Amino acid sequence: MPINQKIPTWFAVPAVFAVLSVISYQTLIVPENLEGAKNVLTMAKTIPIPVAGPESIEFDPKGEGPYAAVVDGRILKWRGDDLGWVDFAYTSPHRGNCSKTEVVPTCGRPLGLTFEKKTGDLYICDGYLGLMKVGPEGGLAELIVDEAEGRKVMFANQGDIDEEEDVFYFNDSSDKYHFRDVFFVAVSGERSGRVIRYDKKTKEAKVIMDNLVCNNGLALNKDRSFLITCESGTSLVHRYWIKGPKAGTRDIFAKVPGYPDNIRLTSTGDFWIGLHCKKNLIGRLIVKYKWLGKLVEKTMKLEYVIAFINGFKPHGVAVKISGETGEVLELLEDKEGKTMKYVSEAYERDDGKLWFGSVYWPAVWVLDRK
């Protein structure tokens, strides 16, 4: 056979592998497109923060803030462009070896923040220590709940308060893992997540929902007749009825197009949910097949799991769902991650501004929609 006819054969094998690699990457790794999404998060203003991971943001009863729960165990308060971020509170007295970029368990890891309007107290879900509270002046938070029905609260995540009933509801995402291993909780299929009802008057902590897979965000609806909680791995939003003829029962309220984190109620009664990222095929397979999820848990470092699920391109996504039907009302994204990454929370203020937190990135963002 002439040499010029053999040359294509020499190139065939690497060419085929190259094509397969591109196809595999496009098929398995690239995040899925979100139909109807508005690529407007690129227009948000970035407010840098000196510590990574403002996972939850909150405003006090006076409207001041936001307050941000960050990776080194502190809650910081934004005092405007002139004063910047200042210390407000912290969840652990152990401050000596705390890192501004990585979780140190002894320092605590504050997550969901909720102010009680009538007292000014700030309730804090700490991913290592439990449910905590600090007064309006800040400082060291006190532990409120670290056990419910004989099981340790390992991963307090987000909560909400019914001020009329003096009851606080919060998620315990796992009784096996703490915050650092959140993605392993989501992909392993481990079902030990709970919703806990804490009665402030009797000091009783009671489990009202269980058998959940990494239940992450939680919020009460506008009339406090039900609460919703979302599972990060399955993308399901569960509803638990607190009042009315269905009280004590649960159902599926919605399914969102990504991996959900915190939930915030709007003044109109709808919900914003921060999405860590859009889905891709590799993420779907890991979550769907429990054996694969457990294999990933045992063999892969957490940072690699995060990279694969994000499609090696961190980006920003948030979804607004109806407070009545659960249907998707709005999808906002930063498709290329040019401005916003790893969105953990979307918080809508009455002035029309949307504030965003991030579980990993050292920034919060604000989008003026008026």
From Swiss-Prot:
Q: Please give the chief subcellular localization of this protein.
A: other
What name is this protein filed under? Protein STRICTOSIDINE SYNTHASE-LIKE 9
Which Pfam family is one of this chain's hits?
Str_synth
Q: What are the record keywords, sorted? A: Glycoprotein, Signal, Vacuole
Kindly indicate where the leader peptide sits in this chain.
Answer: 1-26
Concerning InterPro entries, the annotation shows: 6-blade_b-propeller_TolB-like (IPR011042), Strictosidine_synth_cons-reg (IPR018119)
Glycan attachment residues as annotated in the record:
N97, N171
